[in-house]
């Protein structure tokens, strides 16, 4: 196990640096990752009959998208002002308060590939949400959104992710067509 020290940190619930996370992403055998993940799960929830879940809320950042996928709701073009939206901070505030009142502690933020929402928009949004709700976890932006933000902001992926994390991003969801087989993805998007 060449990644033993990284696994030890994970099992001790110590945060991983981006470089270490990239190292295990590039080099760790899947079986090792599964073993570490299961060990960590058993450590946190020893009873094998107990399953836990996350209470969160999905809030769409915008429905404006230049991608043109056939399967999702992020389909408005910027000029379609009668249907296009960007969620306001007041709407976030209301929805987060509702979520917290129900025992939730995480916000899942996703949206389309808006041609005018670059890194500055997301940094400001994440900082404001964390300022208002410091304990809220932000689980936000799929891989296509991060790539889009990087491209229109003229940044590399690593810089984009580091800046988003510094602004309050806690984790990335794995969702959308990017998780599908290449042939299926091409057919539907």
Where are these regions (language model features)?
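Secondary-structure boundary motif
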Residues: 12, 26, 43-46, 101, ...
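Flexible, active-site-adjacent loop/turn segments at secondary-structure boundaries
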Residues: 14, 57-59, 72, 178, ...
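Residue-level signal for pocket-adjacent positions within structured domains
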Residues: 11, 19-20, 48, 54, ...
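Conserved Radical SAM active-site core
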Residues: 76-189
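Conserved short loop/turn motifs at secondary-structure junctions
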Residues: 21-24, 55-58, 111-115
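Auxiliary Fe-S-binding modules of radical SAM enzymes
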Residues: 1-31, 94, 100-101
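N-terminal pre-triad scaffold of radical SAM enzymes
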Residues: 34-78, 84-108
């Amino acid at each position: 196990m060449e990644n033993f020290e990284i696994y030890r940190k994970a099992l001790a619930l110590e945060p991983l640096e981006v470089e270490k996370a990239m190292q295990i992403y590039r080099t760790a055998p899947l079986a090792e990752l599964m073993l570490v993940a299961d060990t960590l799960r058993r450590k946190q929830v020893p009873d094998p009959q107990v399953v836990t879940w996350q209470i969160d809320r999905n809030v769409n950042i915008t429905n404006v998208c230049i991608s043109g996928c056939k399967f999702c709701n992020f389909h408005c073009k910027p000029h379609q002002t009668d249907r296009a939206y960007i969620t306001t901070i007041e709407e976030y505030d209301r929805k987060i308060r509702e979520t917290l009142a129900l025992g939730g502690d995480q916000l899942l933020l996703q949206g389309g590939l808006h041609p005018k929402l670059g890194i500055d928009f997301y940094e400001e949004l994440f900082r404001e949400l964390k300022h208002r709700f410091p304990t809220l976890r932000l689980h936000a932006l799929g891989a296509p959104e991060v790539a889009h933000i990087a491209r229109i902001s003229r940044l590399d992926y690593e810089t984009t992710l580091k800046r988003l994390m510094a602004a309050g991003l806690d984790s990335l969801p794995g969702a959308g067509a990017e998780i599908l087989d290449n042939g299926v993805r091409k057919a539907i998007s």
